[in-house]
């Protein structure tokens, strides 16, 4: 009798999993994501201290498209003689992602996204004088711009997704480079 209960429970788990699989990408379904962000320059050296973290919120629309909003913190180190000058960016983003292709079960999807960006950049912890007496001409600035990117999403279960993307941001207002490519990897929980 206990063996029958165990087998019944296992069968119900598999049955529930296959039924729930059809409930992916429902309109108005929401998701929270946490991603690690690496600038393209981080891949050119064997080890890099450049990084970023992104917290996102998404709301599904029709046909696998969705609106998304995010807050992102980035830190890059620019070498100067024997020093590294930190540049930190706090960026808010809002945009829309269009489903390009996916398999029939919606387990794997490729999306194209576009976002508007607004943020603030802090150079060397707001200190313009370096230890060797040099003066930084770069200043703290407000940033604004746009970002486009391709993202691959893969469902691990009915509620968890793995996200991998490549993006290029154009940020005006900064005294550093205008175009900033990056790669992200993260997890999203759908509810």
Spell out what each predicted region is.
Residues 21-76, 188:
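Short glycine/proline- and aromatic-enriched beta-strand/turn motifs that initiate or cap beta-hairpins
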Residues 136, 143-154:
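Acidic, glycine-rich flexible loop segments
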Residues 179-191:
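Outer-membrane beta-barrel "beta-signal"
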Residues 24-32, 63-69, 106-112, 140-142, ...:
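Outer-envelope beta-barrel architecture signal
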